[in-house]
Design a protein with these regions (language model features):
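Short S/T/G/P-rich N-terminal loop/turn motif that feeds into the first structured element of a domain
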Residues: 1-41, 45-50, 58-60, 83, ...
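Short amphipathic alpha-helices in soluble, non-transmembrane regions
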Residues: 24-27, 62-72
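Short, well-ordered coil/turn elements that cap or connect secondary structure elements
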Residues: 35-36, 72-74
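Small, basic N-terminal interaction modules of short regulatory proteins
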Residues: 54
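Conserved short beta-strand edge segments in small beta-sheet-based binding/regulatory domains
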Residues: 73-85
Length: 127
């Protein structure tokens, strides 16, 4: 992929039989590797082990590492450049745009209406 400043979605499924803990650790190692670009977002899957990562790819070196699976060697990996998320800020803007345009709600409104669920780790971080 030629570098054209934009975010990419990396979709990664661990090999059959890999324990969830190991899959989570390997995905986190991939996310933590700053050589791959700016890690904008990631999450892990329930059920099939693996996860997804959004990277803001800003250089030829970062782009080249999209072909290097690193700790995800042996995984089913697919990389998809995103249309409107041209940077980390663009990814955040696209999130807000989608909520507001397709559901008529702002992220701040959703945050204000959330209950005190102990699973909501992001509420502990902002307290």
């Amino acid at each position: 992929m030629a570098v054209s400043r934009r975010c990419v979605l990396v979709y990664a499924l661990a090999p059959e039989g890999m324990p969830a803990r190991e899959a989570n650790d390997r995905l986190n190692e991939y996310v933590a590797d700053s050589r791959r670009g700016l890690s904008v977002w990631h999450d892990h899957f329930i059920g099939a082990h693996g996860g997804a990562v959004v990277l803001d790819v800003r250089s030829e070196e970062e782009c080249a590492l999209l072909d290097d699976r690193g700790p995800l060697e042996g995984w089913d990996l697919s990389v998809h450049p995103l249309t409107f998320s041209l940077s980390a800020v663009g990814f955040a803007a696209q999130t807000s745009f989608t909520l507001e345009s397709y559901r008529g709600v702002r992220l701040e409104e959703l945050a204000a209406a959330e209950t005190d669920d102990p699973r909501f780790w992001w509420r502990r971080r902002s307290a």
